[in-house]
Structures are given as structure tokens and as C-alpha cells.
């Protein structure tokens, strides 16, 4: 028996159940991935025992010499990966990375211009229920409701009228390439700071599959646990002129002690992301997403914007007479994990929605390619068309389990 099974059998049993769920199912949530065993090992390492408030060379506690080495390595690796001048790897999440940037250059009631949450944005980009929409005056752009793509001309007009202090570019449910150069030019024209939140596409930006904002925007924020395939956490990239204020905004402005076991795991993830193998992985993520999009479209499922350029597809379920919530539950019964999602022209609550978001990072990490995406797309379409058919869900669940067994989550983990 493991130490955990002996000490806390209840939690051990829950973890075993979650392990089996992941092993036997298909994770298609676009913000999820499967970390390497090396990242898992670092995340659960003895580094968790140490308090390390401050930064390398300027800690408030003794005994941090090896934590300094780990954090410096993480900072150096992510700067090298993205070609950045400065990195802060201490934010516990992407939202906290965004918060630190706001705290650096904004005062309460300053104006933010960012993407509307219901059309693909993120809570921390100025949603009225989030700190970013409570502390600051939030203005939001959306997509062109015909093309369902960003209209940079309209965004520029809004920026000229609103004159925001910050323009945020980035999304959590936008399947198309983002023109960071256009955002940088708009920001420069109106005298705004430009913040690129690449949480979803960081792995694609790091490998050149998607254009990177680094060197164009004032700040770049991200998570490490989506397409970067690292531990749960965030980071900030900026030029050296903002290094000191950004670091001060993170600590002591926003956080106390950093999670050093997670920072060690971030360092591992940045090393992995610099390899040729990771670039091939990132290329396959996009190939898989496009194949799934084509399969779904061929089966009568309308895709928001008509397809995808990245790791995710956004499905419009309106013509099938079911909600995103109903589809999420039906697919979940079949062992396919997705999430309900709002779509442009949304008429339903965000807890119900008219759409689904599906992504390929996790299944690609398991080794699946185009042929598997075609099969998965067929399963999704079949369940969407007949969402009340529990016998169909049970049949597909067995087929999903069979497919998943061919691509072990971790070959040495049972």
C-alpha cells in the first residue's frame, strides 16, 4: 500500500477513481492537458516543504539557495523559449498574472478594453463579476456577428473612442488566429498598454505554430497547464523596463510565498517545450483540431467561424434543439469530457449555453492522430443528434474505453 492509502484511504480512493476516469475516457476540454511524469514528479517533490518569499538572491527566509537555482532556471528557460527580456514565474494562476499586470499600470476606475466573455474572452479580462470588472472601468469588443471573427477595424474605432489605459488581446474560446501585431498597433495609436493573454495558445506560440505576441505587446501573460503541458500556474513576460514593477506587483503586492514545487515543475515544462518533439506535438494538436472540425462539419454540426486555426473548436448546437449543458452531460455519459460554452449571438445562460467547446491537447498528448479524431468526431455528432439515447451513450462509452486503452495515459500507470 502507498503512504496515502495508509494515511488517508478516503482521499486515496477518490484519486484512484479520478485516475480511472482519465485512463478510460477522452478529455476534450480545451484548457486541459496531460502532464509528463517528470512534471508530476517535480510537482509532488520535497520543494513543497520550503517557504521562499521574495526572489532569488533576495529571500526573506534562509535555506533558499536551491530554490533560487530552480526559480532562476525557470525564468531563464521561459525567456529563452519566448524570446523575452524578463519573466516572473511566481503567479499561482493566469488570472493572478493578469491581476499583477493591472496592478502595475492601472489605478482603480482606469479603462480596460478587452474581449467580451460571452464571445470568447475570459473572466479576468473585465467581466463585471470579476475583480477586473469591479475595480476597473471595463469596455468590451466582440466578434463580427457574421464572420464570427475579430474585426480589427471595429476594435480600433472603439479604442479611439474609449481611450483605454490597457487593451487586452487573448481569449478562452476563440478558434481563430489572433493578430497581435494589429492589437499592438492599435494600442500604440491610442497610447494604451497592450496585454496579450496567451493562456490557451502558449504552447503554439512557443513553437511558432501561432504567431507570438512577445516583442509586440507590452506584457504577455499565460498559464502553464494548457497547450504548454505543464503544472497548474501562471507567468508574466515583459521588457526589462517593467521588470521591477511587475515583480513588486506579484510580491509583495499580490502574493506571499511562491509555490516552489510548482515553479520547479514549470522549469521542467519549459525545458520540454523547447524540444523538437514538443513542436511536433503542437503541430499535431492543430492538425487534430482541424480534422475534428472537418468531421463535425461533415456531420452537420455548425462550427463557429467555420473552422479552427488552433487547438479548439466551438460548436453551435442551435439546430439540434439541445443546450450545451445537455450535450455536455450526454457526452460525459459516453466517456467524452467537454464543456458547455457560450457562442456569439448567445441567447441562453452561461450555465446552460447554446454551444460546446472541444479541444485536442490532451488526446494528442496520449498519441492520438487524425484517424482517431475522425472517430471521436463521429461519436460526438452521433450523440448530439440523438442526445436522449442512453443505449447509444453506453455503446459509445465501451468504444471510447477501447480506444483509450490503446493510448495509455501513462504507460507505466495502471
Curated annotation (Swiss-Prot):
Its cofactor is pyridoxal 5'-phosphate. (6S)-5,6,7,8-tetrahydrofolate binds at residues 117, 121-123, 349-351. It catalyses: (6R)-5,10-methylene-5,6,7,8-tetrahydrofolate + glycine + H2O = (6S)-5,6,7,8-tetrahydrofolate + L-serine. The record marks 225 as: Plays an important role in substrate specificity. Pfam families: SHMT (PF00464). The modification N6-(pyridoxal phosphate)lysine is found at residue 226. SUPFAM superfamilies: PLP-dependent transferases (SSF53383). One of its GO terms (molecular function) is glycine hydroxymethyltransferase activity. Catalyzes the reversible interconversion of serine and glycine with tetrahydrofolate (THF) serving as the one-carbon carrier. Also exhibits THF-independent aldolase activity toward beta-hydroxyamino acids, producing glycine and aldehydes, via a retro-aldol mechanism. NCBIfam families: PRK00011.1 (NF000586). This is Serine hydroxymethyltransferase.
Amino acid at each position: 500500500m502507498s503512504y496515502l492509502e495508509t494515511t488517508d484511504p478516503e482521499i486515496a480512493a477518490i484519486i484512484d477513481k479520478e485516475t480511472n476516469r482519465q485512463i478510460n475516457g477522452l478529455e476534450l476540454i480545451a484548457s486541459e492537458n496531460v502532464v509528463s511524469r517528470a512534471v508530476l514528479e517535480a510537482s509532488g517533490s520535497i520543494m513543497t516543504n520550503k517557504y521562499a518569499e521574495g526572489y532569488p538572491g533576495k529571500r526573506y527566509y534562509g535555506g533558499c539557495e536551491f530554490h533560487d537555482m530552480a526559480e532562476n532556471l525557470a525564468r531563464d528557460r521561459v525567456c529563452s523559449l519566448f524570446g523575452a527580456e524578463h519573466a516572473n514565474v511566481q503567479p499561482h494562476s493566469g488570472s493572478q498574472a493578469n491581476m499583477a499586470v493591472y496592478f502595475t499600470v492601472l489605478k482603480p476606475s482606469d479603462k480596460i478594453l478587452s474581449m467580451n466573455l460571452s464571445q470568447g474572452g475570459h473572466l479576468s479580462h473585465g467581466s463585471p463579476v470579476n475583480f477586473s470588472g469591479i475595480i476597473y472601468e471595463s469596455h468590451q469588443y466582440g466578434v463580427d456577428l457574421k464572420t464570427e471573427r475579430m474585426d480589427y477595424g471595429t476594435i480600433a474605432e472603439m479604442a479611439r473612442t474609449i481611450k483605454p489605459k490597457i487593451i487586452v488581446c487573448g481569449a478562452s474560446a476563440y478558434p481563430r488566429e489572433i493578430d497581435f501585431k494589429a492589437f499592438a498597433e492599435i494600442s500604440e495609436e491610442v497610447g494604451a498598454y497592450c496585454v496579450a493573454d496567451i493562456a490557451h495558445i502558449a504552447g503554439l506560440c512557443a513553437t511558432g505554430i501561432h504567431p507570438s505576441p512577445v516583442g509586440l505587446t507590452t506584457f504577455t501573460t499565460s498559464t502553464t497547464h494548457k497547450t504548454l503541458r505543464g503544472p497548474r500556474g501562471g507567468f508574466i513576460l515583459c521588457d526589462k523596463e517593467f521588470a521591477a514593477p511587475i515583480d513588486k506587483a506579484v510580491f509583495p503586492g499580490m502574493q506571499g510565498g511562491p509555490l516552489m514545487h510548482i515553479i520547479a515543475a514549470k522549469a521542467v515544462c519549459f525545458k520540454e517545450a523547447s524540444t523538437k518533439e514538443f513542436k511536433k506535438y503542437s503541430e499535431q494538436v492543430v492538425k487534430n483540431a482541424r480534422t475534428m472540425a472537418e468531421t463535425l462539419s461533415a456531420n452537420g454540426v455548425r462550427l463557429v467561424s467555420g473552422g479552427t486555426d488552433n487547438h479548439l473548436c466551438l460548436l453551435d448546437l442551435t439546430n439540434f434543439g439541445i443546450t450545451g449543458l445537455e450535450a455536455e452531460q450526454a457526452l460525459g455519459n459516453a466517456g467524452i469530457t467537454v464543456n458547455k460554452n457560450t457562442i456569439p449571438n448567445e441567447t441562453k445562460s452561461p450555465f446552460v449555453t447554446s454551444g460546446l467547446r472541444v479541444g485536442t491537447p490532451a488526446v494528442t498528448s496520449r498519441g492520438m492522430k487524425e484517424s482517431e479524431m475522425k472517430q471521436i468526431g463521429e461519436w460526438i455528432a452521433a450523440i448530439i443528434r440523438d442526445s436522449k439515447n442512453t443505449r447509444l451513450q453506453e455503446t459509445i462509452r465501451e468504444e471510447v474505453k477501447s480506444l483509450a486503452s490503446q493510448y495509455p495515459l501513462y504507460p507505466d500507470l495502471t
